[in-house]
């Protein structure tokens, strides 16, 4: 027993070589002295170190010592195989086991979660194990349900999850906190928030993890006010929970600025604002709401800042059009000897794409190459977009061709790059090449339609739109209709553009109407142009450009009085510091 105690202690204190030496020492002791607990400790060690050879050595040693038939040790060995993802060996061991208890089955079920492959395939395998359990005398416990419900959550298998819920109730586990937490996550992901709340209410002794599961479910389903209300209910619970970093991070990820400031006040009161994950969530919330000064104040107040915190600031400024400030923050981050990761590089490159910064892009690319981050798709895709938006198509193409396995974002980026530089036919050729490997999405089709519009490829654009809606069953959105209207309008097919405009499933947006009036203006279709301009004025009566479109139509027909009346109406409804028809030059030498 003394050796067993020392052996277990050394697992936590010594290095790997010392552990293996201890294993050799165990093997020199007669089998009668080798207790199952000692061998169990070595099994845990090997599993945690991911060494298959060590696990197999233990396996052989157990057989040699005649203790292989111990169910306790077999379960430990099975757990070791699953932890190092040697599932073939785990399956073989399982088939050889003469006895199995619920621990054995639970190891297999939770091992399925770690397996590679499609989530539906993993769920199917897990339910095969469940079917076999139900034909034995073994009873499922809360650990079994947690694993099985997790498989349903990952695959969004609603029917199977509901059946598990029924089985859980039948076995009297509906008030158990642990499987109920898994059920709340499952129902939340499936959008059945009423069921999630019902499961939550059935648990009498709730822990904070269960509360957090319901909060995140509300957030996931866009029910921010309800999630915020749960924070108040926590304090009235018998355990008087006040939330933790997960609670506040979930709420901050989706709340409005007013609610975010309330949470900030609570965090200050309970001294959570210095916690790195919570402080980072605060930064994100303020940045998303374009409250960059508040975000900076939070950032400056952080005692410890990690790469994630810096990334949040860089992303926040980049997304709000403050590209130069994002670059400055990146430089400051490097001065503090923090190593940027792939998200940092991708964010910085995205910020460079929003202002003329070709030199900065090249500097970042050199750093990316030096640090070996060029293989990350997010970084490579950002390089394509950055070079394209800064007018360097050749570099964008070089970046694309350097990617070993381009994903859909890579292909879409290069298709858009070619289209925006006037290479419409090459853009379509790239699209056809992509179709041999990947299935397009709505963004890909939007880039292709844009290429057709800029290149005047009417028939190709119509075929593309038809392929999207009929073959790929992708529902056209406002942007797709706008591109199609723009394509037809530019080419002079005003009646066809009008038909598309009127066939939209929703009311035409201002973008679609502007594209239509633009085409009418090019081809001098004044009546259609006036109709579109009047529609624009109905939607946006305070936008000066809409008055200009209609006014120009009146002037082109010689209706000066109507144009003058329209300009008076514009001055009454809009604040426009400029005088229409006049250009202004500032004299800054005074």
From Swiss-Prot:
Any idea what this protein is called? Pentatricopeptide repeat-containing protein At2g46050, mitochondrial
PROSITE patterns recorded: PPR
NCBIfam families membership: PPR (TIGR00756)
Question: Where, per UniProt, does this protein localize?
Answer: Mitochondrion
Query: Which residue intervals correspond to the PPR repeats?
Result: 141-175, 176-206, 207-241, 244-266, 275-305, 306-340, 341-375, 376-406, 407-437, 441-471, 477-507
The UniProt similarity line reads: Belongs to the PPR family. PCMP-E subfamily.
Kindly give the InterPro entries that the UniProt entry links to this protein: E_motif (IPR046848), Pentatricopeptide_rpt (IPR002885), PPR_At4g14850-like_plant (IPR046960), TPR-like_helical_dom_sf (IPR011990)
Matching Pfam families: E_motif, PPR, PPR_2
Q: Transit peptide span?
A: 1-109
Mind listing the GO molecular function terms for this protein? RNA binding
Q: Name one GO cellular component term.
A: mitochondrion
Going by the UniProt record, its keywords in alphabetical order are:
Mitochondrion, Repeat, Transit peptide
Where are the stretches annotated Type E motif?
512-588
User: Which biological process annotations from GO are given for this protein?
Assistant: mitochondrial mRNA modification; mitochondrial RNA processing
- The protein's organism comes out as Arabidopsis thaliana
